[in-house]
């Protein structure tokens, strides 16, 4: 009976596979949104104010960072919790494949969230005249919460490795 439960629990890790695949569909949606933004800005490029162009570019950078985060979580999560990726030797491989454990994945996710939050905060500050001061305060507080959390996670990770 114990062996049955252990095998069933171990096999249940495959329930994560469709979730990771679903993230790839999210990446596809993000890609479509990215190009929608580009096609939206191209006809207006010469009439667009510099600050507005910078806001669009920050949005594109934001989407690129989120896309990278999705890829990292999909691939590392699959490798850590479901199965190793069997990639042909003649195919190009990402240099971090097979090297990111759940602890380093957490740190990379935290760093990515801080970077994404930083870009978002920069966009907010570029449009600060149109945003209520109390909202600005909350944007900064939320961003600092992400920063402090990332530092705390890194510190705790360092403590547990020594």
UniProtKB/Swiss-Prot annotation:
Record GO cellular component, one term: plasma membrane
UniProt cross-references to InterPro entries, sorted A to Z: UPF0114, UPF0114_bac
Subcellular location: Cell membrane
TM segment ranges: 10-32, 53-75, 134-156
Keyword field contains Transmembrane: yes
Membrane topology: Multi-pass membrane protein
Entry's family note: Belongs to the UPF0114 family.
Protein name as annotated: UPF0114 protein PSPTO_4583
Organism, scientific name: Pseudomonas syringae pv. tomato (strain ATCC BAA-871 / DC3000)
